[in-house]
């Protein structure tokens, strides 16, 4: 690294980074909120709608190797500035220039690149400024606050959509990542550079450090956390991308409206993931991370199928099952990330975090598209059975992961 790791008290910076992350994520659910009006306006299939939702993860995957490789060489604070700017520009492009499928994909890719420049670099900002003994709990708070940002994203986007139109959603929410950038600029001091080291000297092997990734994957603990995070992210982001549309179908199927706007409900449900992630990490520290992850993934699969089969039922049952599913999806989120950070060797921690994030958001890339493809394949949005198949297509991966790792003996270790 090209900077001195001067450790400071965590309570100086953790709340600041939690606030910044919440602002940076305000654009995350804009498309999920506007999916239905844009699908009708642009005459999109469910697969196309899912691909636009997946585009943010494509942008993330393209940018995250560069962003995380740089955090091992320069202060992650600088990467954060670039990420905030890209998020701002991507949302503005959606609000002013998007006219159909391909233009929306382009701007969502830019938004994803912005997320790559803020999410894991934001975690690196914290890890460079914390004592090792503090990391696990503060990581759990940081990852849990992903739900705060996405929850407010649903709510604010829904309120703006109801008051104005879909374009206004992106134009106003673009202020979120810009604000995150300014928070880090003014409230997070830079790390002190080490004298005598200059130049980035980045090569493709630095951006895609395959040899280093192989070292990481040869560590059974690290590999398990990474693949677990991939299946977790596939289910999580598919569910978040299609939850508003599913609630819309449920309202039609049951013949009655929900007690709140469906976008507001989606936001509130996301908030349940925050304590779930934090408390889940505390439970994992007591019962063993791997045992907890296995239990949560199986429970999440059951809750997801139960939610999908309840589409014609009363709103209170649907909302209760959606909350249960959200809690179980997020209950192992911090545990998976903390486990990876704690198990990765210090000299390749940045690369390990990059692979973890790359694989996780690779799952996020696949999830919404798989969900939309299965909807088209089995009857489209108007079929209750199609929603069951679509949910089944995303929860099955966690079950397969648990079965595989149990066979390999991973779940019997702490």
How would you name each of these model-derived features?
Residues 62-98:
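Conserved MFS/SLC helix-loop-helix module at the cytosolic interface between two early adjacent transmembrane helices
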Residues 182-187, 380, 387-414:
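Multi-pass alpha-helical transporter architecture, strongest
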Residues 63-75, 276-289, 375:
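Helix-to-loop junctions at the C-terminal end of transmembrane segments
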Residues 107-145:
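Cytoplasmic helix-loop-helix junction between adjacent transmembrane helices
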Residues 142-189:
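Helix-loop-helix hairpin linking two adjacent transmembrane segments in secondary transporters
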Residues 31-32, 221-269:
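Extracytoplasmic gate region of multi-pass secondary transporters
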Residues 188-214, 414:
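Flexible cytoplasmic inter-helical loops of multi-pass small-molecule transporters
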Residues 290-336:
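C-terminal transmembrane helical hairpin of 12-TM major facilitator-type secondary transporters
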């Amino acid at each position: 690294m090209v900077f001195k790791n001067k450790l400071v008290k965590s309570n100086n910076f953790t709340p600041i980074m939690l606030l910044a992350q919440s602002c940076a994520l305000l654009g995350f659910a804009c498309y999920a909120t506007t999916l239905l009006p844009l699908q009708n306006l642009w005459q999109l299939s469910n697969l196309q709608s899912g691909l636009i939702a997946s585009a943010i993860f494509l942008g993330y995957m393209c940018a995250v190797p560069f962003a995380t490789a740089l955090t091992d060489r320069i202060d992650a604070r600088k990467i954060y500035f670039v990420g905030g700017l890209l998020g701002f520009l991507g949302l503005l492009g959606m609000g002013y220039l998007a006219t159909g499928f391909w233009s929306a994909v382009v701007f969502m890719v830019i938004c994803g690149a912005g997320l790559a420049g803020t999410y894991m670099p934001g975690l690196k900002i914290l890890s460079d400024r914390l004592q090792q003994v503090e990391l696990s709990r503060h990581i759990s708070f940081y990852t849990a606050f992903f739900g705060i940002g996405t929850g407010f994203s649903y709510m604010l986007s829904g309120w703006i959509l109801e008051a104005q139109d879909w374009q206004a959603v992106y134009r106003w929410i673009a202020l979120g990542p810009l604000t995150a950038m300014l928070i880090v600029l003014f409230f997070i001091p830079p790390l002190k550079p080490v004298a005598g080291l200059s130049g980035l000297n980045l090569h493709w092997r630095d951006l895609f450090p395959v040899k280093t990734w192989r070292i990481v994957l040869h560590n059974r603990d690290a590999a398990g956390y990474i693949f677990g995070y991939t299946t977790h992210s596939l289910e999580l982001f598919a569910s978040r991308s299609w939850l508003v549309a599913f609630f819309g179908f449920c309202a039609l199927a049951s013949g009655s409206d929900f007690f709140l706007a469906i976008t507001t409900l989606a936001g509130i449900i996301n908030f349940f993931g925050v304590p779930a992630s934090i408390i889940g990490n505390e439970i994992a520290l007591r019962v063993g991370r791997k045992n907890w992850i296995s239990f949560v993934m199986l429970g999440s699969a059951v809750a997801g199928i139960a939610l999908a089969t309840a589409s014609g039922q009363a709103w209170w049952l649907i909302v209760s099952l959606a909350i249960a599913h959200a809690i179980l999806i997020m209950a192992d989120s911090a545990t998976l990330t903390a486990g990876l950070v704690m198990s990765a060797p210090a000299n390749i921690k940045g690369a390990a975090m990059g692979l973890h994030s790359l694989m996780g958001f690779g799952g996020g890339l696949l999830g919404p598209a798989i969900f939309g493809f299965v909807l088209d394949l089995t009857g489209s949005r108007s079929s209750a059975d199609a929603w069951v198949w679509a949910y089944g297509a995303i929860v099955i991966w966690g079950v397969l992961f648990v079965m595989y790792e149990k066979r390999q003996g991973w779940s019997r270790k702490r």
